[in-house]
């Protein structure tokens, strides 16, 4: 490889890393503001999830440049995991405060470290172990302060969402499945289950709820 090619390769790596950080920041901002949007939608959590996923499906298809999907085992497993993560988070926002839900979901790095060690047999670095210990202590104090039944259930669902997000992160990295593809299948799964919930508990549609759902998507 010539000097020019090496310089170009290094520049591309820097740009790629910067882009990844930008996506992480945008994701954090999106998740952090989702909790407030949920409060404007007084629907069944399954219906909320289905409505936002319906919009998300088209966004993912456009970003991917194709709406074709393979319903292979890796894709279906990823779709189920993604659906479960989203549904737990939506339900948590209905049963506890938005701040509680997002803080507990953001414990997922701790579970990434634990699952990498337990399942993938990857040795954790010292800083990862320290981070995990601090987060575990924080969670313990958090639940000691939130003993009311309603909040406790919501907090547990938010914690489950964090665990499932960690599983989803590792699955996306090591399964070899197309992340956007199984994300689209997850959207279809959510819409199908949400359609059944609409029959049993029809939502009251308002302009505010529609704007909030589009924002959530």
Task: Indicate residue ranges for each PLM-predicted region.
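Hydrophobic transmembrane alpha-helices of multi-pass small-molecule transport proteins
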Residues: 4, 60, 82, 114-117, ...
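Loop-to-transmembrane alpha-helix entry segments
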Residues: 69-75, 102-105, 121-141, 145-155
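C-terminal ends of transmembrane helices
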Residues: 59-70, 110-124, 166-177
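Glycine-/small-residue-enriched transmembrane alpha-helix faces in small-molecule transporters
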Residues: 1-47, 77-80, 88, 133, ...
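Membrane-interface helix caps and helix-loop-helix hairpins in membrane proteins
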Residues: 91-96, 144-152, 174, 200-207
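Juxtamembrane helix-start motifs in multi-pass secondary transporters
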Residues: 48, 179-185
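Specific alpha-helical transmembrane segments that line the substrate/conduction pathway
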Residues: 47-50, 54, 90-123, 161
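Specific transmembrane alpha-helical segments of multi-pass solute transporters/efflux pumps
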Residues: 30, 35, 67-105, 113, ...
């Amino acid at each position: 490889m010539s000097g020019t090619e090496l310089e170009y390769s290094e520049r591309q790596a820097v740009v790629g890393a910067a882009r990844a950080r930008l996506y992480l920041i945008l994701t954090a901002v999106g998740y952090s503001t989702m909790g407030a949007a949920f409060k404007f939608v007084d629907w069944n959590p399954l219906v909320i999830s289905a409505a936002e996923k319906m919009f998300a499906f088209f966004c993912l298809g456009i970003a991917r440049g194709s709406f074709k999907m393979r319903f292979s085992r890796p894709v279906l497993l990823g779709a189920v995991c993604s659906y479960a993560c989203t549904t737990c988070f939506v339900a948590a926002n209905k049963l506890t405060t938005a701040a509680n839900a997002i803080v507990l979901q953001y414990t997922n790095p701790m579970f990434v470290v634990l699952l990498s060690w337990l399942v993938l047999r990857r040795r954790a670095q010292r800083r990862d172990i320290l981070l995990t210990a601090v987060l575990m202590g924080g969670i313990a104090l958090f639940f000691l302060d939130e003993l009311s039944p309603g909040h406790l259930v919501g907090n547990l669902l938010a914690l489950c969402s964090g665990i499932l997000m960690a599983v989803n992160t590792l699955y996306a990295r090591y399964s070899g499945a197309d992340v956007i593809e199984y994300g689209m299948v997850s959207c279809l799964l959510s819409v199908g289950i949400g359609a059944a919930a609409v029959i049993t508990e029809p939502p009251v549609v308002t302009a505010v709820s529609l704007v909030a759902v589009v924002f959530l998507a």
